[in-house]
Amino acid sequence: QIADDAVFHSPVVHTPQAGKHLVFAYLSAADQVFGDANFAYVDEIVDDAGNKAMLEFTAEIDGIHINGIDIIHWNDEGKIQNFKVLVRPMKALNMLWEKMGAMLETMKG
């Protein structure tokens, strides 16, 4: 679940994307892009209260290895409040920028 005032921080978009609709759009596009990418979370750090997590992931798309981190904050209702994505290496970041942009355009209809 996503909070109405949630914020998404993309590794390639310079301004935070605010609002449930935009956060949902970015997460949905990522789900489509990573769908067949052998995506896996390989490590996690969760705070004692359980409302913040850093999740390291790996994937591979078009022969390019992707390593990244999702930093997620949940509000007191258990809804996503803040979602930040970091990606490396640069080759993977550039490829994801292209694929995410295309997917978001496709989803607009």
Predicted regions and their residues:
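Hydrophobic pocket/interface hotspot
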Residues: Q1-I2, A6, G19, V23, ...
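A solvent-exposed, acidic/Ser-Thr-rich amphipathic alpha-helical stretch
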Residues: D4-G50
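A beta-strand edge to alpha-helix "cap/lid" segment located at domain peripheries
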Residues: D31-G109
